[in-house]
Swiss-Prot record:
Annotated organism of origin: Schizosaccharomyces pombe (strain 972 / ATCC 24843)
GO annotation, cellular component aspect: cytoplasm; Golgi apparatus; membrane; nucleus; trans-Golgi network membrane
Highest taxon listed in the record's lineage: Eukaryota
Modified residues (Phosphoserine): S202, S219, S222, S235
Protein name as annotated: Phosphatidylinositol 4-kinase pik1
Region described as Catalytic loop: spans on this chain: 706-714
Family per similarity comment: Belongs to the PI3/PI4-kinase family.
Keywords, ordered alphabetically: Golgi apparatus, Kinase, Nucleus, Phosphoprotein, Transferase
Length: 851
């Protein structure tokens, strides 16, 4: 930056002040896209902030680098640099770029697409290639005249002014790496045209590219970039020939390949379940997860839960199929899984004994052609040895899911023909072969040799594969029945469908009664507790067949965690832990992630201002343009489920007493009294305080962000009384059906007022204080919106640049303190028992059965 320019001097002084935050740094990157010097300085400044802050802004940084037409390559190089340093950053960036590749498939000639394509391929090379020479070959200076002339001038000037070479030299070199402007050749255009005419399959093309070759010179996705031909792994004679950095790169590459295929496998399960009737989805899901467990333990984790401060993470050892739950959804099939992990078990430090052996195994090409988590091939007799090679520690040469019992054999005949089997399928019954039970008993007793245990483990995996294959066959037949329903009598179709579904459900009852295969190291003294846990779980499953997620969310998280630990073959490890995530496909979660960013920004403001309000931060991992992982909010249940369950219990009690069941729906206060005791007790008062403080926060957030679709299925109450809002598909400028039906500023129902009771004035007072706090820090919210609103594909930015202008208006910055208090009172008055809120809840109850 020229020091003679007074404006730049003031700007530099501001950049170097203590008040210049990471958020301001991102905002100024957006404001100065065409000033190469400022851009490079800001990227250097951004690199000085903690990684946690940098990761928070990854969506904004990617949006800027793709949509801000700039000659500077500083931001692109900054992103690559961060990905080199941190695996979490590389993974998140990879997924976001993949989603943008799909978005931009219809604009193959745009600069956005070219930048995205270049970055996407560079990230692939970075994370999948184990050879440093391949990565370094991507860092050569291109034939750019202007940077070359500037660099020559800097070198000449550096003779007299050495500082000039030190400061400006790296900028010129970085700019020299900028790819020259050129149009893709005709063959590239043909490839792009195929991508653009089939947008639904573009993500599948990306997946195929990753699975087959990761990055190839002639793949459709890479569009024949001028890059060296890449193979799946680089050939080495021995790990001894590798430097420490190269060994670390081998471990990172191995992690990325397994992690991405693991997440693909989870998403594919959800997609396959779409064709399965709702009554049979739970059984099918658990069979799929049983097969997935054959590849665990593995070098995979849940990126949402990684530590920011070190390249050490948890390692997934098991996903308990019995605990998996289908969430209520008519169109898509999101599901919840309980993931068992060992904390601090996954690292990329090559000098540990375990990682040394792993590096040697990788570079020796033993797993060169191996595909992890490939659930499309369910031949139970293949790749058994590979599935038992994943280790947890040096003392355990074989891992895998040791707790999955053999379930059934003979769900459908092996040679069953779909076109001929419907008439006879209704007579098929599920049986658990006695030989399977005998195997479990031997393993449970611990009286067997290692060879016996290995054989039993392999047989268990064979049976799990058989079950999955037959479950899929049954699901296919069910979908075929729906397709052929008009060509056969309706009664016959229903009979066959019911028979198949009942048999699949009977499988669950059989499984709950089966003992598990435990490793010898497990303490069998807890068997009584395990049987009790199975009985409890069995009762829950029977009681919630119509709503399989109900029991999952009603059970206390810590009790569930302890129950699963006792029944787990890995529960005896001191670093064992349990995490819960939701796998969701068929929905773009980038807007949800952005909403969570904004809500977290509110939370930080209130924490800094020490306001006594409460917000629950949510984490979401975007894994594509229509998929992702969502952190589960534990110990919380929706208001809909609360009212539905209490109403059902009340009516059953009335019928048991010989009374005519009434039609009145219970209130939230009934639940609070049931959950927290007498309204005058200290426990109830604390829950009331928690409700009040969280209601204030979400009332202000709902108004400022214009959160819509606030029915009772999207509002939770946790075990401490806090209210929590979820599902942010409608905010800022988009509304359900593009109709402004929810015109109240926020949701403040009679239920809420009944819980507040005599503390309504306290609610009003805290609303005013919390609103004033966010007004003073409005720029922290508005800047996030301003950065993202241009050229965004998210529905919430339908108004374009007017989005941030409308948000600014809602902050009412022109008002004084007294006028601001009056404004908040007016908002509360409009929201208080709003007729629009009542009508929307009634509409949801009539159309979707939401209480």
């Amino acid at each position: 930056m020229p020091s003679s320019n007074s404006g730049n001097e003031l700007l530099l002084r501001f950049f170097e002040s203590a008040h210049f935050t990471s958020q301001l740094c991102v905002a100024y990157l957006s404001r100065y896209p065409n000033n190469i010097g400022i851009h490079h300085f800001l990227c250097e400044k951004l690199a000085t902030f903690p990684y946690e802050e940098i990761e928070f802004f990854i969506p904004q940084l990617i949006h800027l680098v793709l949509n801000k037409d700039s000659e500077s390559v500083a931001l692109e190089e900054f992103i690559i640099s961060q990905c080199e340093q941190n695996t979490q950053c590389a993974l998140i960036t990879f997924w976001y770029l993949q989603a943008h590749m799909v978005d931009l498939g219809l604009q193959p000639h745009s600069s956005c697409f070219k930048i995205c394509k270049r970055l996407y391929n560079r990230i692939q090379i970075l994370v999948f290639m184990s050879s440093s020479s391949l990565i370094q070959s991507q860092q050569k200076i291109s034939e750019n005249v202007t940077p070359a002339l500037i660099l020559s001038g800097i070198m000449l000037g550096g003779v007299c002014v050495p500082e000039l070479l030190k400061k400006a030299g790296p900028i010129a070199i970085a700019q020299g790496r900028k790819a020259p402007r050129q149009d893709p050749d005709e063959s590239d255009v043909d490839v792009l045209r195929r991508l653009s005419t089939e947008p639904r399959y573009s993500l599948d093309v990306l997946r195929s590219s990753l699975n087959n070759s990761i990055v190839e010179q002639h793949s459709e996705v890479s569009l024949r970039l001028k890059a060296p031909e890449l193979t799946r792994t680089h050939s080495y004679q021995s790990s001894a020939t590798l430097s420490i950095d190269e060994q670390r790169r081998v471990l990172r590459s191995n992690y990325f390949q397994q992690e991405i295929q693991f997440l693909f496998a989870l998403q594919d399960i959800s997609i396959r379940l779409i064709i399965v009737p709702r009554q049979a989805r739970l059984s099918s899901l658990r069979a799929e997860l049983a097969l997935l467990n054959n590849n665990l333990p593995a070098d995979v984790n849940i990126p949402l839960l990684r530590s920011y401060h070190k390249e050490v993470s948890h390692k997934i050892v098991r996903i308990d199929p019995k605990e998996a739950t289908i969430l209520n959804s008519a169109e898509r099939v999101p599901y919840l899984i309980m993931v068992e992990v060992l904390s601090g078990e996954l690292s990329f430090e090559p000098q540990s004994k375990k990682n040394k052996a792993k590096v040697q195994k990788i570079v020796s090409h033993k797993n060169q052609r191996k595909r992890w988590f490939d659930l499309t091939d369910v031949d139970p007799y293949t790749n058994l040895q590979d599935s038992t090679d994943n280790d947890i520690s040096e003392s355990e040469s074989e891992g895998g899911d040791l707790s999955m019992s053999p379930l059934i054999k003979g769900l459908v005949p092996d040679t069953l023909s779909l076109s001929k089997s419907f008439s006879s399928f209704g007579n098929v019954s599920l049986q658990v072969p006695s030989s399977h039970r005998d195997t479990d008993v031997v393993l449970l007793s611990g009286r067997h040799s290692d060879s016996d245990g290995n054989g039993a483990l392999k047989r268990s995996k064979i049976y799990a594969s058989e079950i999955t294959a037959r479950m899929r066959a049954a699901a296919t037949m069910l979908s075929q029945l729906d397709a052929e329903g008009s060509r056969r009598p309706k009664a016959e179709t229903e009979r066959i469908k019911n028979s198949i579904i009942l048999d699949m459900q009977r499988l669950e009852e059989e499984r709950l009664n089966e003992p598990s295969i435990y490793p010898v190291s497990v303490d069998i003294s807890c068997a009584e507790d395990l049987r009790f846990g199975k009985e409890t779980q069995k009762a829950e499953r029977k009681g919630d067949r119509d709503d399989p997620s109900a029991a999952t969310f009603q059970e206390d998280w810590y009790a569930k965690k302890e129950r699963i630990r006792k029944s787990s073959p890995y529960g005896h490890y001191p670093n064992w832990d349990l995490v819960s995530v939701i796998v969701k496909t068929g929905a773009d979660l980038r807007q949800e992630t952005f909403a969570c960013q904004l809500i977290y920004a509110f939370q930080r403001v209130w924490l800094e201002c020490k306001e006594k309000v409460w917000v629950r931060r949510m984490k979401i991992l975007v894994t594509g343009d229509n998929s992702g992982l969502i952190e589960t909010i534990t110990n919380a249940i929706s208001v809909h489920s609360i009212k539905k369950n209490l109403t059902k219990q009340l009516r059953e009690a009335e019928l048991a007493q010989g009374k005519i069941a009434g039609k009145n729906v219970v209130t939230l206060k009934d639940y609070f009294i049931k959950q927290f005791g007498d309204p005058n007790s200290s426990r109830y008062r604390q829950a009331q305080t928690n409700f009040l403080q969280s209601l204030v926060a979400y009332s202000i957030i709902s108004y400022l962000l214009q959160l819509k679709d606030r029915h009772n299925g999207n509002v939770l109450i946790d075990s401490e009384g806090h209210i929590i809002h979820i599902d942010f598909g409608f905010l800022l400028t988009n509304t359900p059906g593009n109709v402004g039906f929810e015109s109240a500023p926020f949701k403040l129902t009679a239920d809420y007022l009944e819980i507040l009771d005599d503390r309504f004035d306290e609610y009003r007072s805290l609303m005013k204080a919390a609103f004033k706090s966010v007004r003073k820090n409005a720029d922290q919210i508005i800047l996030l919106v301003e950065v993202m609103q241009n050229n965004s594909t998210m529905p919430c930015f339908r108004a374009g640049e007017n989005t941030s202008a409308q948000l600014l208006q809602r902050f009412q910055l022109q008002l004084g303190d007294k006028e601001c208090d009056d404004f908040v009172d007016l908002l509360i008055q409009k929201a208080n028992c709003s007729v629009w809120t009542r009508l929307y809840d009634l509409f949801q109850n009539i159309t979707n059965g939401i209480y």
